[in-house]
Amino acid sequence: MPRKGPAPARQLPKDPVYGDTIVSQLINKVLVDGKKSTAERIVYGALESCREKTGTDPVLTLKKALDNVKPTLEVRSRRVGGATYQVPVEVRPGRATTLALRWLVMFTRQRRENTMTERLAAEILDASNGLGASVKRREDTHKMAEANRAFAHYRW
């Protein structure tokens, strides 16, 4: 075990266009093969498309979408004796945001629209309206936690 304690969490810089760290995180999740400018073009294009469709601030739409996708509970495997139990645990705020962004981008890639920009915009709009595959993933995660509530006393 290190004697110095845990390393401090790095602060992510705000993105240059909207001045928000959530947008920076989204850009980093969309990033493939280190092509940051391509990822920025995709994210900014999707946010601009959201602005045109809703007529509101796209960052607020993104945050609303993330609030609808963020899980509050998840299950983690815990081995007790010879059995492995799925133990429901609360999700820390930072992890909830990370999971929400991960799911949003994962289900964006599975959509059928033509360009990645269109897919991301559609998934953000669906999630902000409580629809879409990423919101369904959160519901499934919560159902799994509820189903395994009997094992909650194994929490650590």
From Swiss-Prot:
Cited Pfam families: Ribosomal_S7
GO BP annotation list: translation
Function: One of the primary rRNA binding proteins, it binds directly to 16S rRNA where it nucleates assembly of the head domain of the 30S subunit. Is located at the subunit interface close to the decoding center, probably blocks exit of the E-site tRNA.
Recorded GO MF terms: rRNA binding; structural constituent of ribosome; tRNA binding
Recorded family membership: Belongs to the universal ribosomal protein uS7 family.
Name assigned to this protein: Small ribosomal subunit protein uS7
Gene behind this protein: rpsG
Domain of life: Bacteria
Subunit structure: Part of the 30S ribosomal subunit. Contacts proteins S9 and S11.
